[in-house]
Design a protein with these regions (language model features):
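ANL superfamily adenylate-forming
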Residues: 121-168, 183, 278
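Adenylate-forming
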Residues: 73, 118-127, 220, 246-252, ...
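Conserved AMP-binding/adenylate-forming
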Residues: 46, 240, 292, 299-316, ...
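A short helix-loop-beta submotif of the ANL/AMP-binding
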Residues: 66-67, 73-93, 97-101, 106-115, ...
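AMP-binding/adenylate-forming catalytic core of the ANL superfamily
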Residues: 99-102, 106, 116-118, 265, ...
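Conserved AMP-binding/adenylation subdomain of ANL enzymes
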Residues: 195-215, 223-264, 277-278
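Conserved AMP-binding/adenylate-forming core of the ANL superfamily
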Residues: 31-75, 79-83, 100-105, 151
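Conserved adenylate-forming
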Residues: 57-62, 160-169, 174-218, 240
């Protein structure tokens, strides 16, 4: 099935050129505002900062194909770093700011990062992680004793290096995703992937995209593809203002929406639920909001309708994944039926077909029939970094990306996601790979075997639940569940913590030794 929106022309330019296309004209207009402090970066400062960053990187020998890791919460300078690296021909690998030093080190090693940018509160963790890798230098946004400030990098002038970038071939972003299965993997995204996705959102029929008069809330993290592309890149490309929050706090969020007259709220379902239920919402003037957009995880129809009524504006969903840069579907904002609970319609220049799960064929199923979504378009990744087999498992020779998500399309072209075949857990829209937690659990001295599955949760959407087989000795058998969960919590980022644990005599497995997760998920649902 093809998109019903008109095809869009995708220019053969870099992501920096596309995002900063209006910067000279917009000049002193606020591009990004730091919500807690009010500190502002204008479009002129953003463009100048990106050029100076590129020049400074080049002077240090950082060039085409080199990787820089960004280990920061949301700050206005995030955009300067990202666009400066892109201008230098480099690749940004964006890291979850909640990662432990060990988790950070894994991504630094896997991505081959040469440089690391962080903030003062994260410096010690960054140093600990970098010491285990080939990272050559750490830069800090701000001041920290014994650290090189990022501003040092910007003293090499404002002439970026003359780098030849092939937008369709050269990588610019390397976010990490668990994909349909296994451990987090580097997703290779080119300049063209990102530019295409911005053009697709801007060209979507009956979707009022971000414009120059919009003020967009950026509370969702920039390290995540949703925050990186849908909020930061799309908002700046449209010439609007991005209001940046480093972390979510309901009262501060509401205060900032009211103070700055925010017009667009890109959210995830847990925040949508909070806005529906929190009594303080009624105390604030949120009438400036014209559009609320929910992504990263499914949003229930009743919750969407409730927030739409409360705010007096559309609450629409989209659908996508890191591997698609990320958007493949958007819900119309006007002149078409409002269907809460739908993932929306196909964006321009994109094909989608629904295929019978596990059938081994590629025949497209009819309208209303549930199956796995396959997607093809210019926004689809090049593949997973250094993982050709895992790339081949999900990206076929004809260019179709097999999402692992199960859904159907209705007779008006609206898609609905109902289940997924892939293993990953979505905690507040953030990915948790069961295999990663299982590998960690198996290093616990009392554990013989373990499996991790998703458990439904009203607030978080899903949380990790572990099924654990203890070793036979008396000491191991006496190990309480809370002790194991606490042990895991000390070793992983907060969103990966195991929230429920059940002891079991045996982990169900296939003849080849593969964990039968569906058996455990069904057991969980019936309990």
């Amino acid at each position: 099935m093809l998109s019903t929106s008109p095809r869009v022309t995708i220019p053969d330019v870099t992501i920096t050129d596309y995002v900063l296309r209006h910067a000279a004209r917009l000049g002193d207009k606020a591009a990004l505002i730091d919500g807690p402090t009010g500190r502002t970066l204008s479009y002129r400062q953003l463009a100048d900062g990106a050029r100076r960053t590129a020049a400074g990187l080049a002077r240090r020998g950082f060039g085409k194909g080199d990787v820089l890791a960004i280990y920061c919460p949301n700050v206005p300078e995030y955009a300067i770093v990202f666009l400066g690296v892109a201008m230098a021909g480099g690749i940004n690998t964006t890291v979850n700011p909640l990662y432990t030093a060990d988790e950070l080190a894994k991504q630094l090693r896997d991505s081959g990062a040469r440089l690391l940018v962080t903030v003062p509160p994260f410096l010690e963790k960054a140093k600990e992680a970098a010491a285990q890798t080939d990272v050559e230098e750490i830069f800090v946004l701000g001041a920290a004793e014994g650290a090189r400030p990022f501003t040092d990098l910007m003293q090499a002038g404002d002439q970026p290096p003359a780098v030849t970038i092939e937008p369709a071939e050269d990588l610019v972003a390397l976010p990490y995703s668990s994909g349909t299965t296994g451990l987090p993997k580097g997703v290779m995204l080119t300049h063209r992937n990102l530019v295409a996705n911005l053009c697709q959102a801007e060209g979507m029929r009956n979707f009022e995209c971000f414009g120059e008069r919009d003020i967009t809330m950026a509370v969702l993290p920039f390290f995540h593809i949703y925050g990186m592309v849908v909020i930061m890149m799309l908002g700046l490309a449209g010439g609007g203002t991005i209001l940046v929050m480093p972390r979510f706090d309901m009262m501060e969020f509401l205060t900032l929406v009211q103070k700055y007259r925010v017009t667009i709220l890109p959210l995830v379902p847990p925040i949508v639920l909070g806005l529906v239920k929190h009594p303080a919402v009624a105390q604030f003037d949120l009438s400036s909001v014209r559009l609320t957009f929910s992504g990263a995880a499914p949003l229930g129809e009743e919750i969407a309708r409730a927030l739409s009524t409360k705010l007096g504006c559309p609450v629409v969903q989209g659908y996508g994944m890191t591997e698609a840069s990320p958007v493949t579907h958007l819900s119309p904002t006007h002149d078409e039926p409002f269907k809460p609970g739908s993932a929306g319609k196909i964006v321009p220049n994109t094909e989608v077909k629904i295929v019978e799960v596990g059938a081994g064929g590629d025949a497209e199923l009819p309208v209303g029939k549930e199956g796995e979504l396959w997607i093809r378009g210019p926004q689809i990744m090049k593949g997973y970094l250094n993982r050709p087999e895992e790339t081949a498992d999900c990206l076929d020779r004809d260019g179709w990306y097999h999402t692992g998500d199960v859904g159907y399309v209705d007779d008006e072209g609206y898609f609905f996601i109902v289940d997924r075949t892939k293993e990953l857990i979505k905690y507040k829209g953030m990915q948790v790979a069961p295999a990663e937690l299982e590998a960690l659990l198996l290093t616990h001295p009392a554990i013989l075997d373990a499996a991790v599955v998703r458990k439904a949760d009203e607030e978080a959407g899903e949380v990790p639940k572990a099924y654990v087989v203890l070793k036979a000795d008396d000491a191991s058998k006496a190990t309480p569940a809370d002790a194991i969960m606490g042990w895991v919590a000390q070793r992983v980022a907060p969103h990966k913590r195991i929230r429920h644990l059940e002891f079991i005599d045996q982990i169900p497995k296939s003849a080849s030794g593969k964990i039968l997760r569906r058996v455990l998920i069904d057991r969980e649902k019936s309990s």
